[in-house]
């Protein structure tokens, strides 16, 4: 795509500079690229080229600033304490006598399985919390599996009515204790519940509701919090080496990003609900992980291998002391068990975990750089955006213009070999695929040749998807949409016409999918009369034509940039972050003015990188977005906007953080990061090599992917 009508004004107003139409206005282009009033030629103030040093210097600063902003956010959003039961050890017999549970039926809905070894105080507190928050309308059995405790556990639990107390004659260890107790489970669902856990209101109802609200649920876990009120984990992620990360560790559990139900790599066995039949079929916890640790990770991976999903449901909250039940075994035993079982998990599941460990990086792709009849008609035969790119001039000292392409030159996208070279370059550095802008105006296509010739050929073999840039083409970009060249005409009939055209692409083997659902982006859903109805028509048409379900993501452009509207309001599955929209912090240019007619604005790239990278996540699926830079003065010489201090180092720091956040927040095919853009040359937003930076921005992409495997976060 390209920049929008109010780009310069929005940059000034700190709103959301976005894109402008690639069918550039010639009169503006010629006038605004005139060098008549520029005081100094470019050669008077040369800018340094990449030398392997200075272009990376912003990396450490930007990473540090991101960490500082996130820490400051945590400090200004204190957590709330939870009401935690804390029995006086001298009162344990009295507390045990007060426990009363209803007798379960012969075939209860849920069996709560509590493995214990000593720690009678914790066990009674756990049972008391269950009694306090057990739904009266659910048939529940409670099983306490005592692994030969040597304290007063047996004596204290003996008088408790309507619990099933199982006692091992000798200590079997956590894993075998759980597996042996499973033979006594009668419930349709089983909850593994550690005795150092206390449940809260609504916990069991919420966990059970997951199976009604989502498809193919195999296991679900709650939000774990510490007694201090801090988040312990909101699900967990796994790395191919077997190590895990507790999502949201020590964060505020009330943050929106931790408060929507989502799929995860695994959930902790400290509180895990699953269908009993499934658990018995797979044999419970694998004895490969004796005596304990990593058995819950393995269980969840096994459940997923059976074709089911593992969910985190934050509407169920439990308080977990963490490791109190294993503390008596000693730290040396614990660390040795962890080290051994991490190695076992790695050998068993590394290839499975590897499949989705790295987020897929998708670059927006502008299909503009070739002659089209509309450009010939309006601006002169043979006009392409290279005309604007090549004659841009610096407006102030330090302003990087013009941008001169290196490896690929001023290419023509009518040549399939150009697209092949682009694909080779992208894949060499770790880019997964391209998201082509798709232009449709009531049945008329524009700039369609690159993606059409891609569809008609098996080359290049690169994944791709489409983003419908569904807005009017206008002659002047003042935000008023006057002098419309080609108008949009959204209607029921057009909805069906456009999806029928798109289905051709969805059926291509290279088309990017999310869980086997073709991914379609919509640039401005708010321009439709009711995009939720449009999305419903699209989904129905795709089902009727054999495509199946599709995955629709809305771009957070214009008013959506900071609104945090849930995608479901528009009938969408997810949202796509689209920098620099919404978080710009304009500043005066830092260098001496060269163009006295310049009325545009600048901003510091490092600021936008920090703002987006440290931005709190919403309570829905939002794909992170990054950009290598931004400068639209090639189109608006006197009134454009630009970012200074755009360097590969700063970009890498931003991308690294986005990759890390994506890995924690999303699962599987939803681990996507979008880059704006591959080839937006007239906006200064491109990864393709230029003469100043060479391949360094592409190297930053590769570095960020590598660093995400090397930098371990607690």
Where do the protein language model's features map onto the residues?
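Non-catalytic membrane-proximal stalk/linker segments that position and tether the catalytic domains
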Residues: 1-108, 332, 337-357
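A recurrent flexible, glycine/aromatic-enriched loop bordering the glycosyltransferase active site
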Residues: 175, 183, 231, 237-277, ...
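Glycine-rich, basic loop-to-helix element that forms the pyrophosphate-binding segment
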Residues: 168-185
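Conserved donor NDP-sugar-binding/catalytic core segment of glycosyltransferases
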Residues: 197-238
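Short, acidic, metal-binding catalytic loop of nucleotide-sugar glycosyltransferases
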Residues: 128-139
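A short, conserved alpha-helix in the catalytic core of glycosyltransferases
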Residues: 205-207, 263-283, 288-317
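A conserved acidic beta->alpha catalytic loop
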Residues: 146-155, 170
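Short aromatic/hydrophobic "clamp" motif used to bind/position activated sugar donors
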Residues: 190
